[in-house]
């Protein structure tokens, strides 16, 4: 398994993310009509949850917000909210919530 994943990332991986954040800050999302699922932890220590909440409030399309309640067995930074390696106790619930959301938006 370890052949296909890592817990260590080079700092150069942050450059594209920083560029994306800069671009997004300059955009207006109030006219967006695409539905969105916002699935995150209010205890995220990597991304300021209040900034996520502020972004959600500007989303023009229909949206659903799910605040993930992390456990002691999950990502200690409450940032990676699903996945068998970092947040194994969240994966099944995340799969169920996302699947339900997709089915729900397809009904309409």
Residue ranges, per PLM feature:
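Alpha-helical membrane-targeting segments
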Residues: 1-14, 45, 84
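Generic structural signal for well-ordered, non-membrane alpha-helical segments
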Residues: 6, 10, 48, 87, ...
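Active-site nucleophile elbow and catalytic-triad environment of alpha/beta-hydrolase enzymes
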Residues: 11-29, 34
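Extracytoplasmic/secreted proteins, especially bacterial periplasmic and envelope-associated proteins
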Residues: 12, 16, 51-54, 93, ...
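Structured segments of extracytoplasmic/periplasmic soluble domains
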Residues: 20-23, 58, 101-105
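Short beta-strand/loop motif that positions the catalytic acidic residue
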Residues: 32, 37-40, 44
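Short alpha-helix in the alpha/beta-hydrolase fold that links the catalytic acid
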Residues: 34, 47-61, 67-70
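Catalytic active-site module of serine/aspartate enzymes centered on a nucleophile-bearing elbow/loop
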Residues: 69-108
């Amino acid at each position: 398994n370890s052949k296909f994943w890592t817990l260590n990332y080079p700092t150069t991986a942050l450059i594209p993310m920083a560029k994306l954040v800069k671009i997004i800050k300059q955009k207006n999302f109030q006219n967006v009509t695409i539905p969105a699922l916002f699935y995150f932890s209010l205890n995220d220590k990597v991304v300021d949850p209040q900034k996520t909440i502020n972004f959600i409030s500007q989303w023009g399309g229909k949206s659903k917000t799910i605040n993930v309640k992390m456990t002691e067995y999950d990502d200690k930074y409450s940032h990676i909210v699903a996945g068998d390696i970092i947040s194994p106790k969240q994966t099944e619930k995340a799969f169920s919530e996302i699947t339900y959301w997709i089915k729900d938006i397809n009904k309409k």
